[in-house]
Amino acid sequence: MPTPEPPQKAETTDAPGPDRGADEAPGVDPWDRMPEGALNRPDLDGDDDEPASSGEGGAGAPGPGGDTADAEDSPGDDGAPAEGAPAPSRLDFLPSPVFVLLLGLTGFAGWLSWRAVELDWAAEGASVTPLIPPLLILLGWIVSSAVHEFAHALAAYLAGDRSLRGSAYLRLNPFAYEQAFAGLVLPSLYLGLGAFGMTGPPSYVDWDRIPSRGRRAAVALAGPLASLLLSAVLAAVVTVLVPPGNDTTNWAIAAMALLSFANLTAALVNLLPVPGLDGFEVLAAAAHRAPWVPAARRNALFGSVAVFAVLWFPGVREVVVNLVYGLFDLVLPNPVFPGIAFYGELLLQFWA
């Protein structure tokens, strides 16, 4: 039986030879017996965006296994990262090496404070002004502030603000914040001057990307919730180390007690519905399209500083401090916790 001619467009790469097997039944169309894929048809198997090529190894030609190259693996194809732009990675959600180093320094300062090594370094009978405990408190507060902002950023990302992926806020790197003054400098100044915790406004969140009121409110409340959890963990550690009926002047324990106090004040103060605080964003979630919301957000930094200035007044600060200490007395079994936290305040403000 003569071999039928293939279509003119097709290029036969492994067409059957002229000899037919003896078992081939007469009258059967040879095309029905031809193995699938025997014809190299670029217009059927190749990429429509690539010209057909009859040369060996040309575009659209199958490899040794008969498979064509995956279009997604080719540089410049649709779906591939733009030239010069970093590809999305799981590393976008891992803590940065800077944060790991920060944790290590905090732990080392805590160990030195626990051992009170500065007393061993000083000459016998000499007066000692401890400098490692205030460093421990500062490092611990930077870590606490980074966790506060991370909670905002993670909630915002999950709620729809994908622009935060890979940012310093999600990777817990406070030294690379876009709003470093509001996220790093101001909280450190608030703690150093007032010995209580406050954070800057979450101005890095793109609230327009978050679709619903409930999600926007959840993003705003994520930061205070994280600070509240940190305060509870630190208070629990202090309670375990100093059981009821005992007291201590250990520098590391006093630093943890003060950090617990600072995180609790940060959680409570941030609930105030004032521009620059998280409570305002809860209020703005219900009136997202109101004309006064963008103007208030543009001046959020001034609102945060104004709240700190009011709380810094001696009479107001005394009321706030007594309120927070009263909450600790209600929850914790050891009534000496406020005294331990106050000792941490004395260690922090060594210049006073």
Where are these regions (language model features)?
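Hydrophobic transmembrane alpha-helices and their immediate loop junctions
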Residues: 1-352
